């Protein structure tokens, strides 16, 4: 059986043997797509492996484990059905292994959503589980899709943004940096809370919150760990990665910053058996002003909701954390980063009334 090839550009027609179509996922190589590239096949026909073509059955796709499994727990993946998991694992595989084009068969969609909407829905959860899949894939025109016909069958062609070798290099550099940060945790940090405090402190104090000149093509975790600057998703992804690598179950959630009505991302993590919420980007902004209290470290659901509105798809899926690590002696909850709020924080610090700082 011959191998399929890309004809011309990415969006051009693809020649595929009819016998290789049923129940398949197709993924095209990420870099330098030309007419000589092999079409990679994923489906139930394990015989399609000639001339270097890779073949994976559906069960293999469903059973795929992340190359970076130490950085994620799959909190949201555990809440998906089989077809959603099929999409989740396919996009995760493509992202981790360097592919930009995916062809999803119609039978992986349940019909309750528009096709692209369902894919965006699943990728959103993947991006909150994995620090290596950008949150803005589905919000900054990085994701496009259209239905194409192959041998009489319909496939949804998804194109992820092509990022190239530099992206891969920065991702790996950030991963190695994360390993060294986790390895630096002092021996006296022998509980989940102490480990989390140490890592959260590292993130908040070794980065600057920036928006001007920020490119959506950046690698958020590398922006923070390598360059020392990031936006909220860089902070959240880095917390996800570091906490999980330290054995602390962590994921992130998307929503809106209440004070600015802008998109925002926060974390939740399980410390010593209890879930709490975290906003390292907000604490980093306070840190830049000369203060180091953990006003956003270990919030309850209610406290997190004072400054953050969870997106609808997260409101019923995220843990409703009841406990808080915020100091009982603090009579305000910071809901913005205005000068007045920071002034109040300074007064609390000077009075000695606030004891929930990172040390």
Predicted regions and their residues:
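N-terminal accessory/pre-domain segments preceding catalytic cores
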Residues: 3-12, 17-190, 305-359
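Short, solvent-exposed coil/turn linker segments
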Residues: 35-38, 112, 219-224, 259, ...
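Solvent-exposed loop/turn segments at secondary-structure junctions
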Residues: 165, 205-210, 230-232, 257-261, ...
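Secondary-structure boundary elements
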Residues: 166-224
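Hydrophobic/aromatic-rich core segments of domains that either
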Residues: 234-304
């Amino acid at each position: 059986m011959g191998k399929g090839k890309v004809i011309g550009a990415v969006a051009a027609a693809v020649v595929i043997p009819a016998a290789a179509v049923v129940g398949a996922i197709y993924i095209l190589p990420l870099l330098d797509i030309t007419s000589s590239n092999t079409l990679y096949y994923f489906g139930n026909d394990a015989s399609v492996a000639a001339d270097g073509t890779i073949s994976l059955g559906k069960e293999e796709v469903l059973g795929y484990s992340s190359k970076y499994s130490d950085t994620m727990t799959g909190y949201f993946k555990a809440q998906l059905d089989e077809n959603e998991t099929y999409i989740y694992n396919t996009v995760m595989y493509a992202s981790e292994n360097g592919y930009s084009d995916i062809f999803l068969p119609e039978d992986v969609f349940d019909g309750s959503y528009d096709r692209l909407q369902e894919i965006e829905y699943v990728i959103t959860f993947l991006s909150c589980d994995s620090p290596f899949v950008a949150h803005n894939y589905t919000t900054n025109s990085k994701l496009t899709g259209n239905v194409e016909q192959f041998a009489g069958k319909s496939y949804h062609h998804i194109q992820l943004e092509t990022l190239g070798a530099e992206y891969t290099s920065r991702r790996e550099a950030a991963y190695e940096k994360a390993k060294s940060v986790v390895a630096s945790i002092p021996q006296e940090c022998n509980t989940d809370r102490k480990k989390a405090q140490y890592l959260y402190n590292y993130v908040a104090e070794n980065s600057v919150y920036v928006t001007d000149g920020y490119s959506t093509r950046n690698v958020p975790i590398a922006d923070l760990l390598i360059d020392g600057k990031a936006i909220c998703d860089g902070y959240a992804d880095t917390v996800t990665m570091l906490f999980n690598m330290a054995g602390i179950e962590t994921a992130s959630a998307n929503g809106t910053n209440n004070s600015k009505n802008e998109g925002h991302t926060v974390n939740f993590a399980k410390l010593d058996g209890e879930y709490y919420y975290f906003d390292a980007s907000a604490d980093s902004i306070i840190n830049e002003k000369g203060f180091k209290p953990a006003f956003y470290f270990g919030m309850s659901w209610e406290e997190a909701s004072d400054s953050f509105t969870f997106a609808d798809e997260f409101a019923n899926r995220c843990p409703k954390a009841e406990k808080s690590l915020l100091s009982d002696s603090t009579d305000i909850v910071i809901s913005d980063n205005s000068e007045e709020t920071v002034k109040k924080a300074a007064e609390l610090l000077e009075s000695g009334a606030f004891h929930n700082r990172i040390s």
